[in-house]
Amino acid sequence: MTTVVLIGTQWGDEGKGKITDFLAEKADLVVRYQGGNNAGHTVVVGENSFKLHLIPSGILYPEKICVIGNGVVIDPKVLKEELEYLRQRGVTTANLKISLRAHLIMPYHKKLDELEEEDKGENKIGTTKRGIGPAYRDKAARTGIRVCDLLDKELFAEKLALNLKEKNNLLEKIYGVEGFSYDELYHEYLEYAEIIRPYATDTSRLINDAIESGQKVLFEGAQGTLLDLDHGTYPYVTSSHPVAGAACIGAGIGPTKIHEVIGVVKAYTTRVGSGPFPTELLDETGEFLRKQGYEFGTTTGRPRRCGWFDGVIARYAARVNGLSGLAVTKLDVLTGLKTIKIAVGYRFNGKVINEFPASLKELSQCEPVYEELPGWSEDITGARKLTDLPENARNYLRKIEEITGVPIKIISVGTRRDQTIILDQVF
C-alpha cells in the first residue's frame, strides 16, 4: 500500500504519535491534515522523548518530507517555538512543507476562545484555549487569514485591519476587555511570515505528485473519532474532522488515492475534558490505569479520565472511518489486573443497544454491558511477536478483533519504537 491514513478511534490520546513515528520509517511523506496545536503527541526515540503539537512526528526522520496540510490551523508563534525546539535537539526541519492554503491562528482567536469558555460557566466544553475553534469559525465565515495572505504584505495588512475592527469591537463592547493593537500584530506576524516563507508551498500538488510516482504517504490524524465535529460526542468535540474522510479535504487529494485506513485504539479508554463517558472508572482501577499509563495530557497536562475498553465506540469508529486495520496501544498498562472488562453493548431504558447513540442525553443514561476476561501478570514490554504474549493477553486482543470486525496489524507494548509487535505490514 502506498497511502495510509492513521486515525484515533476514541477521544484522542490513543498513542498515534508512537504509531505514526513507527510507520514513518517506511513512509516518504508524513502529512498532518487537520487540527492545530491542541493536539499533542509524544515520541520516544531511544532514551530521548520528543513532545510535538503541530509539526508531524515524521520530522524525527531527517530524510522524510513532513507536510502541514491545508486543513490544519497554524499558530505561527507555536510553529516558531517548535522549529527552535527541534533545532536545539539536533533535529533538522529542512524537509518541512506548509500549505499556502492553511489558515492562521491569531492572538484574538486565543483570547476569544478563553473568554467564550469562561462565559459558558457550568456548561464548559473543555477547550484547550488555543484558539482552534475561533480560527475554524473564521475559516467557515470566510474571514480567516491564510498562509498565502500572510506572505503578501499588502493583502495581510488589509485582512488584518478588517478582522481587528470586528474582533476588537467584540472584545471591548461585549466582553469589556482591551482589544489588540494593529501595529503590534502586523509587525509580529510579518516576522512570522519570513519564518514560514521557506516552507510554504502548494502541498496538494506535492502530495499528489508523490502518490503518482509511487512514493509512500502517511496521513497523520490528530485527536480522535469521538472528537469529530460531525461524528463525535457533540458539542464536546473539536472544531475539525479527525475522521479518515477528512484526510482528502485537509490534504488536497481525492478519495481514490487512499489505500488503507489504520485505527489506533488504546487497550483501555481515556478522555480529557467534559462529556459522557460510559465506561469511566472513578475507583482505584481508574487510578491504576492513570498512573500506569501516565495519563496526563501532552498539551494541557490535565489528568485524563480513564475507563475500560469500549467495544461500542471501537465498532462505531470502524464503521465511520472504514478501518482496514487496528493498531492497539498500551497493552502493557493492563498488566497486573486480575480481571479486565470490555463493554460489548450499552443498556438504555432497560434494553441492550449495540450502536453508539447520537444523543448525548441518551449516551449519559447508557450503562455499559461488560464481558469479563482474565488478566495477566507477566511483563510483556519485551514481547516482539504475538506468541511472546501470555495467552490471556492474546485472548483479549482476539476479543477486540471479534467486536470490531477489524484485524489487528500492530500491537504496542511500550513507549519505545522497538516495543512493537507487527502482525501484518502496513506499508
Curated annotation (Swiss-Prot):
Residues noted as binding IMP in the record, renumbered to the chain: D13, E14, G15, K16, N38, A39, G40, H41, T128, R142, Q223, T238, R302
Enzyme Commission number, as recorded: 6.3.4.4
First-tier enzyme category under EC: ligase
Cofactor binding: number and manner: Binds 1 Mg(2+) ion per subunit.
Pathway stated in the Swiss-Prot or TrEMBL entry: Purine metabolism; AMP biosynthesis via de novo pathway; AMP from IMP: step 1/2
PROSITE patterns per the UniProt record, alphabetical: ADENYLOSUCCIN_SYN_1, ADENYLOSUCCIN_SYN_2
Subunit details: Homodimer.
Protein name: Adenylosuccinate synthetase
UniProt source species: Carboxydothermus hydrogenoformans (strain ATCC BAA-161 / DSM 6008 / Z-2901)
Source lineage: Bacteria, Bacillati, Bacillota, Clostridia, Thermoanaerobacterales
Gene of this entry: purA
